[in-house]
């Protein structure tokens, strides 16, 4: 996780208990899997009601590149082929131009979220930061209502979290 963020268990407690909106307690779970011997690679996952909603890893991003047709080889065989175009594509398509993100981008977004006020986070250009913010207990019902105005501008995966929070706060009466 890095010194700025502390331990994963501490960060998970912060995200799932300390800062999570009361209406979502017990419904959101974060997971981190670290792979020994793979240069510190991790997979971060977000679960809602025990269903994985979002995954953050190099492999998730690379699979996105392949499935979206960004690679010259649409059917890589073997590890070398699979990863051959990853780094150039990662450089060519920064996070704001894709819908899948690496573990490092997850950590950077989490650090940004932790180190700025909630209003900056909810208006962030980074959709991962906005995900953390919309689940935050400091976002009230009036702010949630205002967020509905920008709902269509959100990536599909972020909309799921907006809807989840809005429905949790309103018992499903206002959101579509």
Language-model-detected regions and their locations in the chain:
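Alpha-helical scaffold segments
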Residues: 1-176
